Amino acid sequence: MSDKKQKGLEWQDNPLSDNERLKEESNHLRGTILDDLEDGLTGGFKGDNFQLIRFHGMYEQDDRDIRAERQEEKLEPRKFMLLRCRLPGGIIKPEQWIEIDKFARDNNYYQSIRLTNRQTFQYHGVPKTKLQDMHRLLHKLGLDSIATASDMNRNVLCSSNPVESELHQEAYEWAKKISEHLLPRTNGYLDVWISGKKVQSSDSFLGQEDEPILGNRYLPRKYKTAVVLPPLNDVDLYSNDMNFVGIKDEKTGKLAGFNVLVGGGLSFEHGNTKTYPNIALELGYVPVEDTLKAAESIVTTQRDFGNRADRKNARLRYTIQNMTLEGFREEVERRMGRRFEAIRPFEFTERGDRIGWVKGIDKKWHLTCFIESGRLVDKPDLPLMTGMLELAKVHKGDFRITANQNIIIANVAEEDKRQIEDIARQYGLIRKITKLRENAMSCVSFPTCPLAMAESERVLPEFIDELDKIMAKHHVEQDYIVTRITGCPNGCGRAMLAEIGLVGKAVGRYNLHLGGNIAGTRIPRLYKENITLDEILSELDGLIARWATERDQGEGFGDFVLRVGIIKPVVNPVVDFWDENLIPTVAV
């Protein structure tokens, strides 16, 4: 018998990462979290629990603005938790929102709510002493935060298209079904946060807590899923591990099935050429009745073949690289018990939200409110958080958080439209903004993210102000360029699908990437490395001047810089993302 490893499993020759031990020894994700909750000597979690709380939807953070000051005073960092709610499709009820708002005001260090591009909300700054209260509140509201972080299938995205209301409802139901189907089966979340019950690993019922899909070591790495309805790519489909592109049956008007695309992901590590961003690849088409079986088969293939030795190469895109796309498809088909059909034709033309009012085919109105970087907080001149609360008090429909960090006041009856608009205008939820700002995005970064290398959310408004001036200077202010800033290369701001992407390198310095496109189907290439925001604006001034005068009719900025040779396209990131021969040494 040959000892040769099955293709894709060569990583098994190396020691497993310590995270694999942690998961296996975690008592089905319980760890000793309850003991840490009783420890008042520290505001954080110790040992394995620091990682385990991520499976419950939380990250331990601290205020980096005052970290050095507290260190000088011999104090531990001001520790607190980020919580990310599980909210497949981003739909939330006004009565739920009122309670979510109250908790943020009463218990959140920053007194804000952050809408994320994973189509949910986050709390930043929740002290350890309030964590059980927070989870019990979510439970009372019919919500939870299980599996919104760490090595699981995270919050499932779904197109927020309010116009085709019946089709959207179908897509939303599938997003919920996929989310529920891929959840962990353990009761650990409920035991720790709701009942506060300590369960020992020897307890007999633990043997029944089987994880038939995720396994007892769960997935090798984070896993992101989206459901999308063309032609609007409002979930940034190509950035996700697993994607379901809804195909409409033209006879019935209902969903016939899904094109399945896999292996997207935008994170990489500065200087590590074994890491790279990539767009999702076409796997095949499945009829709607086989959706869950396809999802499960893809996930279990990643579970069994994904790299558990090197977490930097553990995402699905690396598994596909190791197995080859054809090899991966064959393994998924074997588990699924059927072959994929040929991809059905589809096209994406844009991906931003439709800011303002739109009317659905069901005659209901939907108001999309622009929320810069998703931050709902009350500022003296812009009390957005209170505005949302006031809307929640009177709105009879629902809210939909979008994957572009905005929020839709959905299902407004004709007779209620004026009241909703008046409140939204009063609190700045309707205001004049440029198309450039509408299509900009940032991650949180400083002061709460421990991975941040440079500012992101806090510099985006001023950066867009300056870029708007450049656009006006060159008479292209009616157009827009998809612009995104992320504070480190982990990719939370999705800069690796932008026409202009800034990736934090050090405090005040960024790598500038150019050449993505409006539809979000292309990775931008590194153009300038380790430069300041002022230097970036200077570079963009010259490039936008050329775009304004030399572009073809309707040509986007990202397409233009490729066509005229300012930047070379990223054709296959596995091969050419890091190719130094393709990176400009001087501006063209």
From Swiss-Prot:
Pfam families named among the record's database cross-references: NIR_SIR, NIR_SIR_ferr
Disulphide bond pairs: none
Cofactor(s) needed: siroheme; [4Fe-4S] cluster
GO biological process: cysteine biosynthetic process; hydrogen sulfide biosynthetic process; sulfate assimilation
Residue span of region Disordered: 1-20
GO molecular function, one term: sulfite reductase (NADPH) activity
EC numbers, comma separated: 1.8.1.2
Reactions catalysed: hydrogen sulfide + 3 NADP(+) + 3 H2O = sulfite + 3 NADPH + 4 H(+)
Broad class of enzyme this protein falls into: oxidoreductase
Top-level taxonomy: Bacteria, Pseudomonadati, Pseudomonadota, Gammaproteobacteria, Pasteurellales
Compositional bias of kind Basic and acidic residues: 1-10
Co-factor remark: Binds 1 siroheme per subunit.
Family the entry assigns: Belongs to the nitrite and sulfite reductase 4Fe-4S domain family.
Domain of life: Bacteria
Binding site for [4Fe-4S] cluster: 443, 449, 488, 492
Keywords: 4Fe-4S, Amino-acid biosynthesis, Cysteine biosynthesis, Heme, Iron, Iron-sulfur, Metal-binding, NADP, Oxidoreductase
Role: Component of the sulfite reductase complex that catalyzes the 6-electron reduction of sulfite to sulfide. This is one of several activities required for the biosynthesis of L-cysteine from sulfate.
Residues that bind siroheme: 492
GO CC annotation: sulfite reductase complex (NADPH)
Subunit architecture: Alpha(8)-beta(8). The alpha component is a flavoprotein, the beta component is a hemoprotein.
PROSITE patterns tied to this protein: NIR_SIR (PS00365)
Pathway(s) of this molecule: Sulfur metabolism; hydrogen sulfide biosynthesis; hydrogen sulfide from sulfite (NADPH route): step 1/1
Name the UniProt record assigns to this protein: Sulfite reductase [NADPH] hemoprotein beta-component
